[in-house]
């Protein structure tokens, strides 16, 4: 799973996610992408589950880019512990995602396969997402 090798601080404030994605909102690598439509925190486990869903569906063809990284630690206290006596220890890592952010990119696969792969990945994520394509690419089968 993804997590930073080292950080400046061990714990982080919870904070709020405001506004739209300032960067990372356009396709930079692949022909197809999965774009976030709402703000949320996506855990490293969710990113890994989505990655596995995509790679299983495309079956070793094409190339996948993960455009988000879980760099924020989330701390929690153990069960049945009284309040107070400091902040809990870091339990897992999350990526703060704003609307418009590209989460994954794919290239080297046909559009319909990319669309189904992203739909399977979307089922693993806690937010609404949209499949986007570079200009000139098709993501739906022509009847």
From Swiss-Prot:
Gene Ontology process terms (BP): translation
GO cellular component: cytosolic large ribosomal subunit
Region (Disordered): 1-20
Pfam family, one: Ribosomal_L16
Keyword Metal-binding: no
GO terms assigned for molecular function: rRNA binding; structural constituent of ribosome; tRNA binding
Keyword annotations of the record: Ribonucleoprotein, Ribosomal protein, RNA-binding, rRNA-binding, tRNA-binding
Annotated Basic residues bias: 1-17
PROSITE patterns registered for this protein in UniProt: RIBOSOMAL_L16_1, RIBOSOMAL_L16_2
Subunit (UniProt): Part of the 50S ribosomal subunit.
Role summary: Binds 23S rRNA and is also seen to make contacts with the A and possibly P site tRNAs.
Family in the record: Belongs to the universal ribosomal protein uL16 family.
PANTHER family (UniProt xref): 50S/60S RIBOSOMAL PROTEIN L16, LARGE RIBOSOMAL SUBUNIT PROTEIN UL16M
Protein name per UniProt: Large ribosomal subunit protein uL16
Species annotation: Zymomonas mobilis subsp. mobilis (strain ATCC 31821 / ZM4 / CP4)
Gene name, Swiss-Prot/TrEMBL: rplP
């Amino acid at each position: 799973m993804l997590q930073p090798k080292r950080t400046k601080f061990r714990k982080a404030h919870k904070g709020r996610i405001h506004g739209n994605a300032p960067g990372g909102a356009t396709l930079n690598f692949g022909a197809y992408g999965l774009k976030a439509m709402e703000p949320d925190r996506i855990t490293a486990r969710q990113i890994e589950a989505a990655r596995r869903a995509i790679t299983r569906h495309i079956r070793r063809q094409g190339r996948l880019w993960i455009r988000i990284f879980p760099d924020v630690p989330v701390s929690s206290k153990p069960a049945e512990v009284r309040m107070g006596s400091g902040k809990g220890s870091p339990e897992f890592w999350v990526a703060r995602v704003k609307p418009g952010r590209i989460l994954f990119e794919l290239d080297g696969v046909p559009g319909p396969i990319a669309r189904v792969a992203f739909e399977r990945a979307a089922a693993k994520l806690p937010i609404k997402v949209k499949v986007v394509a570079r200009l000139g690419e098709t993501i739906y089968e022509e009847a």
